[in-house]
């Protein structure tokens, strides 16, 4: 029975994200193959317009 706290140390092995070729941010997921910031590696680019302009989250809470 070794679930829980002792197993959490196993999660920090290796890199999950590397630098994205398109936007340059450290958001490109190696396993999934796309960038979490700009969407590089997918068919469409991720657009985050209004929330970035206003500087706060937009939508239902």
From Swiss-Prot:
Q: Which GO terms describe its cellular component?
A: ribonucleoprotein complex; ribosome
Which keywords label this protein?
Metal-binding, Ribonucleoprotein, Ribosomal protein, RNA-binding, rRNA-binding, Zinc, Zinc-finger
Q: Which is an annotated GO molecular function term of this record?
A: rRNA binding
- Record-linked InterPro entries: Ribosomal_eL37 (IPR001569), Ribosomal_eL37/eL43 (IPR011331), Ribosomal_eL37_CS (IPR018267), Ribosomal_zn-bd (IPR011332)
Cofactor binding mode and count: Binds 1 zinc ion per subunit.
A Gene Ontology biological process annotation?
A: translation
Under the heading Pfam families, the entry gives: Ribosomal_L37e
Q: Which positions does UniProt annotate for Zn(2+) binding?
A: 20, 23, 35, 38
PROSITE patterns from the UniProt entry: RIBOSOMAL_L37E (PS01077)
Q: Name the protein family.
A: Belongs to the eukaryotic ribosomal protein eL37 family.
**HAMAP family, per database record:** Ribosomal_eL37 (MF_00547)
The name on file for this protein is: Large ribosomal subunit protein eL37
Q: Which organism is it from?
A: Caldivirga maquilingensis (strain ATCC 700844 / DSM 13496 / JCM 10307 / IC-167)
Q: What is the lineage of its organism?
A: Archaea, Thermoproteota, Thermoprotei, Thermoproteales, Thermoproteaceae
